[in-house]
Amino acid sequence: MNTAYIGRFAPTPSGYLHFGSLVAALASYLDARAVGGRWLLRMEDLDPPREIPGAQDAILRTLETYGFEWDGELVRQSERHAEYAAVIARLLSQGLAYACTCSRKQLEGYAGIYPGFCRNACHPDHDAAIRLRVPELDYHFIDRVQGEFRQHLGREVGDFVIRRRDGLFAYQLAVVLDDAWQGVTDVVRGADLLDSTPRQLYLQELLGLPQPRYLHVPLIIQPDGHKLGKSYRSPPLPADQAGPLLLRALRALGQQPPTELQGAAPAELLSWGRANWDAMRIPRSRTLAEAQLR
């Protein structure tokens, strides 16, 4: 096994896996396995109020039904709260983060860019969100599919939340710490997270953590213009359609499975995918229309 490549799939149990999830899982799986790399599974269960009972078990069953095999033990973010809290305490003590008591109503009209109301205040950090101070700098990276991506953190994002006011830890912090802890070298995920990457680069730099390579695959868009996702009640992956949907996902990723694989079992499709994977064939687009993939 090639330990120089470590990839991962990190679903959230706020719903079941859908076709968009399958495309992301397949891309990350094949990108790792094609070079003999490791593929890890992490459950991003940071938000218990949004978690659907039974979703974690359903996600695991679906991955197994579709032929995915992961390395090592399943990691749950809910088991790593102490690590997140320790880093936040460090950032606060260094003046790199601060407590914010702004309400959603106060922030209406700012287009999601924090205006800095609490930046120079001295609020206690209980009953407050914790925000990370961001520099007035332009961050950029080369995505393996999407190419160069740039974002000015100060103008386009503002100081961002790393712990919510209700005490729940934010995705941006947890994903950076977990990727580093697990030794992830390659992050392959949906293009909806492209905009988050500069924030993660900044956190990696601030904490002295290694920077993985990034590859963002196109999102699958429904006819109404919404992405396939849990928020829009996209249909879960059916157990009896694993072969046809894997074949469709391969094509969505620009791979060219031969016609004789029509009707093939998941194991055969994944074997072909490992042997023939070419990330350069992935469409250089942030979105793909679901209707075009049928």
UniProtKB/Swiss-Prot annotation:
Its EC number is 6.1.1.-. It is an enzyme of class 6 (ligase). InterPro entries: Glu-Q_tRNA(Asp)_Synthase, Glu/Gln-tRNA-synth, Glu/Gln-tRNA-synth_Ib_cat-dom, GluQ/Sye, Rossmann-like_a/b/a_fold. A motif ('HIGH' region) lies at residues 11-21. A motif ('KMSKS' region) lies at residues 227-231. GO terms for cellular component: cytosol. One of its GO terms (biological process) is tRNA modification. Its cofactor is Zn(2+). It holds the Pfam family tRNA-synt_1c. HAMAP family: Glu_Q_tRNA_synth. PANTHER family: GLUTAMATE--TRNA LIGASE (PTHR43311), GLUTAMYL-Q TRNA(ASP) SYNTHETASE (PTHR43311:SF1). This is Glutamyl-Q tRNA(Asp) synthetase. It comes from Ectopseudomonas mendocina (strain ymp) (Pseudomonas mendocina). The lineage of its organism: Bacteria, Pseudomonadati, Pseudomonadota, Gammaproteobacteria, Pseudomonadales. The gene is gluQ.
